[in-house]
């Protein structure tokens, strides 16, 4: 089940790269993109729009690591990631972003501007 939610990246970054799962919704006014990022503070998330791709980058650190602790199991992915999300051809402008319950929620407004 773990592999179902956090896959190693096929984008060619590094062997340690991982991809958080995303959901993309659309209505007549906007696209809503939900990225599961528990443990990643919003200040450490970089969001860009390149061509028709929404690009989300960040680095999740291990918060409980320390020299006096013994690691018994490490299943949660850590390290840098880059997630590229293709947004269907539409003219978009930045809407809002919020971090709710470990998820980054991005709203991209549709526009008719040329």
Feature roles, as predicted:
Residues 1-114:
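Alpha-crystallin/small heat shock protein
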